Each structure stands twice: as structure tokens, then as C-alpha cells.
From Swiss-Prot:
Belongs to the NAD(P)-dependent epimerase/dehydratase family. HldD subfamily. It comes from Burkholderia vietnamiensis (strain G4 / LMG 22486) (Burkholderia cepacia (strain R1808)). This is ADP-L-glycero-D-manno-heptose-6-epimerase. It comes from the Bacteria. NADP(+) binds at residues 11-12, 32-33, 39, 54, 75-79, 92, 143, 169, 177. Substrate binds at residues 168, 179, 186, 200-203, 213, 292. Homopentamer. NCBIfam families: heptose_epim. The lineage of its organism: Bacteria, Pseudomonadati, Pseudomonadota, Betaproteobacteria, Burkholderiales.
Amino acid sequence: MTLIVTGAAGFIGANIVKALNERGESRIIAVDNLTRADKFRNLVDCEIDDYLDKTEFVERFARGDFGKVRAVFHEGACSDTMETDGRYMMDNNFRYSRAVLDACLAQGAQFLYASSAAIYGGSTRFVEEREVEAPLNVYGYSKFLFDQVIRRVLPSARSQIAGFRYFNVYGPRETHKGRMASVAFHNFNQFRAEGKVKLFGEYNGYAPGEQTRDFVSVEDVAKVNLFFFDHPEKSGIFNLGTGRAQPFNDIASTVVNTLRALDNLPPLTLAQQVEQGLIEYVAFPDALRGKYQCFTQADQTKLRAAGYDAPFLTVQEGVDRYVRWLSGQV
């Protein structure tokens, strides 16, 4: 049976395609918008059966042109949290997603989709409950609104619907994302260009570089998606993060030490890196005051209750792997 991945040339979509390939799955229809043509590179080492532009996909899928479809991994969306065109955002992230969902329900195909931790906005609790959901931008709102649709549909759905609220994802195949790429990606490139990594200084009671996020490797994101693909009886909306908040200092320090290791240099402690000017703290920008999350951490209770029991990579493990991968690309 056919598998479909939307956003297939994007960051998470391409990693899911690759993970499916590694399991012997190649009957995959890749759906994307290659107006930004350089994204094609994410699929060069992947095996797919066909490629479709997103503008023609939904109509053809709803018409049954692809025969029996087992599952749709819906990763396609505008993921720029700074986008201010609300009409564009809602059309791409909400209306389009509803159309894909409707086609999946009509055909009995598994629907696994990308939600976002941006739904939580400024909340200090990160649990899949309506009362803690308060998005701060139209991107978060587009994801929030679609999750509300899912909550209404789930009780009567006859096929799987599984949504994943991605936290701060990093890893291979994100180069095309530019400013929206991960902190690890930007730290890597900054250190190679300038010989140092710059982090925000003290803010809101957090020491320099100690603002925290739940940083999750795209390897783990793909594994969770495939776990639910293998268990079509499991539906719901799930946080997808490590359950561990780690500071930006951990990302920067790991980037520095991994690059040093590749140059046959010994590791340094964070204090030594700061002392030697390899990590530099800059004043927290006024423009971000009051709009910046200093802490995120996924509550994994629902994910673990669904049966996913594999460990997640720490920043030290995942970023080390990623930096080595990036170094092999340049």
C-alpha cells in the first residue's frame, strides 16, 4: 500500500521519508512546494515512488487517484513563527490540514500530523490540556485551531489520528530553514565563521546562557512517528519532546567540544570555554523582553502511557551526532 508524506522535502518530512526507507518502505508519494528549490537536496538520498506539488495533491487524494493509501504523514506547513500574514498562515496550516484530514477519514488512512509546542505560548505547564493552551502568534494559533478540530473528530473517527506537538527539534536536513533553523545549526555555523558562539546574557532571573528549552533530536521525532505508524489503534494528541529542559549553554558547549574533538583538541568545561572567549554572552535584546520563553519542557505522561518507552537523546548525545553530520557536509 502507498504511503504519503506531505512537506516531504522539508526538515522533519525528509527525515521521516529516510526513516521509512531504512525500513524498506519506498512506495512513498512525496508532496511539497518546491518554489524554494534548494529543498530538493533533502530527498536526493531518499527513495520515493512519486512527487506531487501540494496544489494538486488534496484534490487527487480525495478523488482516490492513489489507490489504497495506508497512511499520511502530514508534515507540510508554514513553520515560520515570525510570519505575520494570518490569511496565508491559516490557509496553509489550518484549511489545507483540514482537507487532508477529511480525505484520510473518508478513505480510512492513518493520519499522523505535525502539531507544535507553540500552542502553549507563555504557559509554564506543557500538558495536552485545553486550559494551558494560549498561543502567542498566528503560527501557534493555526496549530491550536487544528488541534481543536481533532479533539472534536477523534471520538467518531474510525481510523487513526495522531498529532505530535514538536518541541525544539534539531538535526540533519534543516539547512533550508534559514533563520528558523535550530540553535545547534546556528551555533555550528557561527563557531566556524567567528571562532565563538554568542548566547543571550542574564534575563528574567536566568543566568547567562541558562534559559532552557526541551531540545529534541529529529532522530527521536522520526522514531515516535514510526511507533504510532506501527500501532494504528493508538490515537490522540501527544507532546513530542525529551521531557528534559536543558540550557542553551549545553548546546553551545557541545558544539564547541565536538568541533574541537574533530580537530583532535581536548574538551573544555563551560567555564573554560567562556574564559577563552569561545562562548560569549551578549545583552538580552529589548525587542524580545516580555515575548521570550525562558523554559519549555514536554510532559511525556500521555506519550509514555501510549506505550512509547524508548529513551530520548540528550543534548550532549544528539548535538554531538548532528555536529559530526554537519561537518561531513561542508
